[in-house]
Amino acid sequence: MKIRIKIKLILASTLLSSSVLASGELHLDHANTNISDTASLQNGAKLFMNYCSGCHAISFMRYNRIAQDLNLSDSLVAQHLMFAGEKPGETITTAMPEEGAAKWFGGTPPDLSLVARAKGTDWVYTYLRGFYKDDSKVFGVNNK
């Protein structure tokens, strides 16, 4: 049941983003990405695990695959990216309980495994750059 809902959400977001992009209503900043820049990718993994993984899962990724893709040893990944005794072959889930997510956010924050593939790196870059300080919000930030 949960898998069907996730698939529907991914498909809906893909269709929605495609229709918005086709209509020309959304300007996307260009993400100057370089998938060969291993140091930058390692930094991105560190930032995600430190700032995003508390709420967002990337359940189609495994810790040992991140180690392999980023030329890191399993011990380095365990030391710097695994915080709750996970095993290298496990998928990356969030520690946030669903009932807490519903209470705090009105729903479970989306799994980010396929966002860049579904919406594109320019969309992700634009979205992340859209955050600003907003003291009226619970977490002190908001997004355009």
Model-assigned labels for residue ranges:
Residues 1-35:
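Post-cleavage N-terminal segment of exported redox proteins
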Residues 23-46, 57-68, 77:
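Electrostatic cytochrome c docking/interface patches
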Residues 46-58, 94-98, 108-119, 123-129:
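C-type cytochrome heme c attachment motif
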Residues 53-54, 79, 136-140:
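Glycine-rich loops and low-complexity Gly/Arg-rich segments
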Residues 62, 70-73, 130, 142:
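Residue-level signal for alpha-helical context at structural boundaries
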Residues 66-103, 107-109, 115:
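Structured domain cores in non-transmembrane regions
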Residues 121-144:
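Extracytoplasmic/lumenal ectodomains and periplasmic regions of secretory and membrane proteins
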